[in-house]
C-alpha cells in the first residue's frame, strides 16, 4: 500500500487555470490560453518567454501546484522529484520545428525551438526556476490516465528518494493536426504536489493498493489524475 | 533485500548486431561512424542507404546501423524506422513471459515520419508519437500490458533501467524488460547542427581538441529479474545470470536547460545515491563508463565530477567516438557493455582521444586497460539538467 498527502494542485485547461481558491477563467473562446510570465512568476524570467506552448502550460501548472502547496521558490535547492505523463508529447512543437526545417531547407532552423522538441525540457525549466534537484522524467504512454507515472512517483516518495513529488499530466492540442489511432487526451496540464503524511494540511490522502492496482482518495476510487483533480475540487466546493 | 539481476542483454549498434561484436570492436579500436555523403571517404557504409543530404549541416558523420530500412505497416502506410530497429532488437531476445513489465526509452522514436504529415495532415500515422513505441513492442512480444516509455533526453534509458530496478526491488514487479532505441533522423541531426553541438570530424571525447558530438543510432534490451524469477528461468534453461544492477541514482542540476552544471551537482547527487543503494563507497568502483559526448561542457563537467569524487587512479572511458551518441539508447547500450566489462575486466579505450583535455590524463586512455575486481559505474546526463547513474556488479561464475 502506497499513500501520500496531496499538498497542492495546479492546472491549465482550455476553460481555466490556477489552483484551488485562485482560479482564472479563460478569455479565449477556444484552445489553450496564452499565459504570460507576469501571471505566474514572482519576478521576470526570460526563459519563460522562450518556451514553446507545451512547455509553458506544463511549467505554469507545476508553478501553480507548488504555490498551492506553499512551497516557495528559494535559493536553496530542494530534493523534489517531477514526473509528467503524456500521450501526445510536444507534437505541436515538433510540427512547428519541422515546418521551419522544411521551409529553410535545413539551413536555419531555430536552436531554441529544437531544444523544446524534447518533451521533458519543461521539467528541466521547472527544476531550474524552482530549484528542484530530484528525479525528473516523462512517462509517455497511450493510456491517458497518468496513473503509471503516479505509481512510479509514489514508490519514489515512499522509498525516501525525494522529499516531495510533483506529478501530473501534460498534453498538446493535437486536434488541429488530425485524428490519430490512439485515445486523444484533453489538451492541457494538471499537476499535484505529494508529500509523505505529516501535520501540514492538504487536499486529502491518495492511496494506492498495489495488489489490486487501485487508487483512491478517501473512500472514492480514482480512475485518472483528471478524476483526482475533479474530486478535489468537488470536495472543496462542498 | 531483493537483488536485481540482468538475465539477458542485447544490443544493436553501428558496430554490429550483438553485444560481443560491439565489445570486441571497441577493444580492437574499430569505428562504426559513417561519412554520410562521401562514399570515397573511409568509414562510408555502402550498405547504409542515404538518409538525407548533410551538406547544409555542420557534420557529415553519424553512427548508422547497416541495412536498417523502414518497412510498411500496410500498403502506402509507412512505419517509422524505429519499428524496424525494434523488430531487429526483439529478434535477438529469448521468449519473454507475458506478465513481464515493459519500459521503453526513446527521445523521439518515430519522428522520421513527421515530414509525411506536414505535407498531408489527414491522418497522423501510427508510430509518430513516442507513446506508441511501447504498445508496438508489447504487441510484438504478446505482453499482457502495453508498457510505457521514459523520456528524459540522453538519460532516458539509464532512468528506465533505474525505474525497472526500483520496481523489482520494491516487489512491484518480478521481471521488467527495458527496450531502448533511437535512430538518426534529419529532424534530430538538424537540431544538433543548429545548436552548434556537432563535431565536423568524428567525436573525440575528452580530447583537448574535441569539437563536439557525433550522432549515432542504436538499441539495447535488458531483461531484469528478481532472484526467484531468475532461478525459474535458469531451471528451464532460458536465461543465465549475467550481472546485477546494485545501485542507481537520478538527479537534476537545476542549473541550465542545454548545458550541464559546471560543478556537476546533479551527476554527483546521482552517483552518491547509486553508491548508497549499492552500499559501497566511491573508492570501491573500479571502472567508469562516462557519458563522454565530446562536447566541451559535458566532458569538462564529467572530469570535474571524476576528480572530485574518485581517486586519481580511477579509469574511465567513452564509447561515443566509435558508435556516436545514440541519445535515448545510449544509457542502456553502455549499461549492457558494462556486463562485458565485468566479464573481461578490460575497459575499452576512448576512440578519438589523442591529446588529453585538462584533467583527463591517466583517467582516460585511447587503449584498452585491465581493471581490478569490483563494481563498475555508468553514467549519463542530458538536456534539462537530467543525470543518472547505475552501478553494476557481481558476475556469476
Residue ranges and their predicted role:
Chain B
Residues 1-7, 374-375, 387, 394-395:
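Extreme N-terminal starter segment of soluble prokaryotic enzymes
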Residues 103-106, 151, 176-182, 224, ...:
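Short beta-strand segments
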Amino acid at each position: 500500500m502506497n499513500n501520500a498527502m496531496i499538498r497542492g494542485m495546479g492546472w491549465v485547461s482550455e476553460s481555466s487555470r490556477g489552483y484551488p481558491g485562485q482560479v482564472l477563467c479563460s478569455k479565449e473562446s477556444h484552445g489553450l490560453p496564452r499565459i504570460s510570465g507576469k501571471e505566474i512568476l514572482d519576478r521576470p524570467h526570460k526563459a519563460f518567454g522562450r518556451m514553446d506552448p507545451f512547455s509553458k502550460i506544463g511549467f505554469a501548472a507545476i508553478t501553480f501546484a507548488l504555490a498551492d502547496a506553499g512551497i516557495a521558490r528559494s535559493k536553496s535547492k530542494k530534493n523534489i522529484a517531477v514526473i509528467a505523463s503524456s500521450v501526445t508529447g510536444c507534437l505541436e512543437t515538433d510540427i512547428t520545428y519541422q515546418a521551419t526545417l522544411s521551409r529553410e531547407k535545413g539551413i536555419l532552423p531555430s536552436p531554441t525551438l529544437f531544444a523544446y522538441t524534447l518533451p521533458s525540457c519543461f521539467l528541466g525549466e521547472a527544476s531550474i526556476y524552482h530549484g528542484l534537484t530530484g528525479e525528473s522524467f516523462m512517462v509517455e504512454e497511450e493510456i491517458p490516465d497518468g496513473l503509471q507515472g503516479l505509481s512510479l512517483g509514489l514508490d519514489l516518495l515512499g522509498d525516501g528518494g525525494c522529499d516531495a513529488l510533483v506529478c501530473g499530466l501534460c498534453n498538446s492540442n493535437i486536434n488541429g493536426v488530425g485524428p490519430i489511432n490512439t485515445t486523444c487526451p484533453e489538451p492541457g496540464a494538471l499537476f499535484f504536489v505529494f508529500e509523505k503524511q505529516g501535520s501540514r494540511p492538504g487536499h486529502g490522502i491518495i492511496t494506492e493498493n498495489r495488489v489490486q492496482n487501485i487508487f483512491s482518495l478517501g473512500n472514492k476510487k480514482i480512475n485518472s489524475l483528471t478524476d483526482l483533480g475533479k474530486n478535489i475540487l468537488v470536495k472543496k466546493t462542498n | 533485500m531483493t537483488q536485481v539481476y540482468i538475465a539477458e542483454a542485447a544490443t544493436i549498434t553501428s558496430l554490429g548486431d550483438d553485444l560481443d561484436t560491439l565489445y570486441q570492436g571497441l577493444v580492437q579500436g574499430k569505428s562504426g561512424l559513417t561519412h554520410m555523403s562521401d562514399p570515397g571517404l573511409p568509414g562510408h557504409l555502402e550498405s547504409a542507404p542515404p538518409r538525407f543530404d548533410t551538406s547544409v549541416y555542420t557534420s557529415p558523420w553519424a553512427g548508422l546501423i547497416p541495412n536498417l530500412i523502414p518497412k510498411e505497416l500496410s500498403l502506402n502506410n509507412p512505419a517509422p524506422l524505429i519499428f524496424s530497429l525494434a523488430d531487429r532488437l526483439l529478434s535477438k531476445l529469448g521468449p519473454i513471459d507475458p506478465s513481464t513489465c515493459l519500459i521503453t526509452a526513446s527521445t523521439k522514436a518515430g519522428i522520421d515520419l513527421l515530414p509525411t504529415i506536414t505535407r498531408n495532415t489527414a491522418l497522423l500515422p501510427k508510430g509518430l508519437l513516442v507513446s506508441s513505441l511501447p504498445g508496438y513492442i508489447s504487441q510484438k512480444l504478446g505482453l499482457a500490458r502495453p508498457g510505457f516509455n521514459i523520456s528524459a533526453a540522453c538519460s532516458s534509458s539509464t532512468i528506465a533501467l533505474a525505474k525497472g530496478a526500483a520496481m523489482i526491488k520494491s516487489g512491484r514487479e518480478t521481471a521488467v524488460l527495458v527496450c531502448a532505441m533511437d535512430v538518426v533522423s534529419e529532424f534530430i541531426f538538424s537540431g544538433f547542427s543548429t545548436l552548434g553541438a556537432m563535431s565536423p570530424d568524428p567525436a573525440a571525447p575528452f580530447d583537448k581538441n574535441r569539437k563536439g558530438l557525433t550522432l549515432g543510432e542504436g538499441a539495447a534490451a535488458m531483461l531484469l529479474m528478481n532472484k526467484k524469477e531468475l532461478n525459474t528461468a535458469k531451471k528451464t534453461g532460458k536465461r543465465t545470470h549475467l550481472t546485477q544492477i546494485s545501485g542507481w541514482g537520478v538527479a537534476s542540476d537545476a542549473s541550465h536547460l542545454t548545458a550541464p552544471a559546471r560543478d556537476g551537482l546533479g551527476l554527483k547527487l546521482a552517483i552518491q545515491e547509486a553508491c548508497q543503494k549499492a552500499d559501497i563507497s566511491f573508492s570501491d568502483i573500479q571502472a567508469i563508463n562516462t557519458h563522454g559526448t565530446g562536447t566541451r561542457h559535458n566532458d569538462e563537467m564529467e572530469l570535474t565530477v571524476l576528480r572530485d569524487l574518485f581517486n586519481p587512479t580511477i579509469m574511465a572511458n567513452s564509447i561515443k567516438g566509435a558508435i556516436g551518441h545514440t541519445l535515448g539508447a545510449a544509457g542502456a547500450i553502455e549499461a549492457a557493455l558494462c556486463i562485458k566489462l565485468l566479464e573481461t575486466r578490460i575497459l575499452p579505450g576512448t576512440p578519438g582521444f589523442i591529446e588529453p583535455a585538462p584533467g583527463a590524463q591517466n583517467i582516460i586512455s585511447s587503449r584498452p586497460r585491465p581493471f581490478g575486481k569490483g563494481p563498475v559505474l555508468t553514467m549519463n546526463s542530458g538536456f534539462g539538467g537530467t543525470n543518472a547513474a547505475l552501478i553494476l556488479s557481481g558476475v556469476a561464475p
